[in-house]
Design a protein with these regions (language model features):
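Short intrinsically disordered, low-complexity coil segments enriched in acidic
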Residues: 1-2, 16, 141
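Bacterial N-terminal signal peptides that target proteins for export
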Residues: 1-12
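Sec/Tat signal peptide C-region and signal peptidase I cleavage site
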Residues: 16-23
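N-terminal secretory/targeting leader peptides
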Residues: 24-116, 128, 132-251
Length: 251
């Protein structure tokens, strides 16, 4: 995953370096739902923004607003960037059900391999099949997280039967259907709401990848963690790094 983030930092900055002329300093507002310590912000967006500033000779500055600091909820990020409320966002495609139907294919269970391999496949898929889903945006990058795991407050999950009747959080409609198929009672919500739901007993557990756990302190609220054996993981979700199309074309 770290290798792929370094690749994104290098490749995404090229999009800005290809622009030939600027009229003074341009300030771009970046908005996302994870807190600043999350890998997506600290190890991707922050170094990327610094690289953009340096290689544009100080003419393009990216202001980073993590944790929904500019208002709204995570599912609204795609509308915020499309409508020009902000200039750039990082979000989960499946937080807006039905908006990106082609991309939901990558949420199907037991599909993902590593984050790197699945992300490369997603990029090719977007370039060749799913471009219509993202026609209203300037796509800076698309990628997937490492295969998601099952995390529960107390109960150890050793088989699908152990999930029967458990209230389990899923991030998207495809993954909540998967949880329902496994016998759980699915509860859909973005990841920033998970800690509160665990603390209040709204859910018994959730599915998330390992790398997001520390950012939201979810490891402090769960005791049991279950992985899926084999070469394929349980699931993944596509991430979108998008820019307002008109803003990009104005540079």
């Amino acid at each position: 995953m770290k290798l792929f983030l370094r690749f994104l930092v290098a490749s995404a900055s090229v999009l800005f370096l290809s622009i030939s002329a600027y009229a003074g300093e341009v300030v771009l507002k970046f908005h996302s739902f994870p807190p600043m310590p999350a890998n997506s912000n600290a190890k991707f967006v922050k170094p990327w923004s610094e690289k953009v500033l340096a290689e544009s000779n100080g003419e393009i500055k990216v202001e980073i607003y993590p944790a929904m600091q500019l208002g709204g909820k995570p599912p609204q990020l795609v509308d915020q960037v499309r409508d020009g409320v902000v200039d750039i966002v990082w979000t989960v495609a499946g937080y807006t059900p039905g908006r990106f139907p082609h991309l939901e294919a990558f949420e199907l269970p037991f599909m993902p391999a590593s984050a790197e391999a699945t992300s490369q496949a997603l990029q090719e898929y977007v370039d060749t099949v799913a471009a219509s889903d993202l026609k209203d945006y300037k796509v800076l990058a698309v990628f997937c997280h490492a295969p998601g795991k099952i995390h529960t407050k107390e109960k150890v999950i050793k088989s699908a039967a152990d999930l029967n009747g458990m209230k389990m959080r899923g991030p998207t409609r495809v993954i909540t259907k998967m949880l329902e198929g496994l016998g759980a009672t699915p509860v859909g919500m973005p990841v920033p709401a998970v800690a509160g739901a665990l603390s209040k007993g709204v859910i018994d557990g959730m599915v998330v990848p390992w790398e997001i756990m520390p950012s939201f302190k979810l490891h402090e609220l769960t005791k049991a963690h279950t992985t899926v054996s084999g070469s394929r993981g349980l699931y993944t979700t596509p991430f979108l790094f998008l820019m307002n199309k008109a803003k990009y074309e104005s540079l």
